[in-house]
Amino acid sequence: MKKINYILAVILTISSFGTFAQSQKINTEKSTINWLGKKIGGQHEGLINIKSGELEEKGGKIVSGSFVIDMTSITNTDLTDASYNQKLVGHLKSDDFFGIEKFPTANLNITKATKFSNGKASVTGDVTIKGKTETITFDIVKKGNSYSAKIEIDRSKHNVRFGSTSFFDSLGDKAIDDLFILDIKLVVS
């Protein structure tokens, strides 16, 4: 009888490990954020670094997550002319766009998620850019110790006004799409 009780205690102890949340730090060296912004007649793209972050999983779903994005690290990868590249990056860092002197970071905080099914889940979270917060929902894919997501963000919700038809009329071919895309690859350790 003691042996059966001991075996049951061991089984219960082992099975209870699966119910605890597992916190995982984001490996900022291996994780990437590619951005894409479109305008009439073209587009630009580049990279932004993740400063810090973590994900917490429990029972096959993300229960929380927070990420700090280093807006001072924004780069452009499609312009090969150094002068034009510098000009664009400087403009993106200026108050016309992300105002990095006042807002050096952006944040994403996951508030809820569905359970992973075939490696995919739906995530809802709050994204804060330039001090303005918007709730967004997006799909995330998990493969091993990495996660990927493509997130569309409406810059007009974050007071990023330059070239936006949401704020200015008669921009014609100078208009820049309000939506920009973040293609995120997270590696946890």
Positions of predicted regions on the chain:
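Bacterial Sec-dependent N-terminal signal peptides
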Residues: 1-24
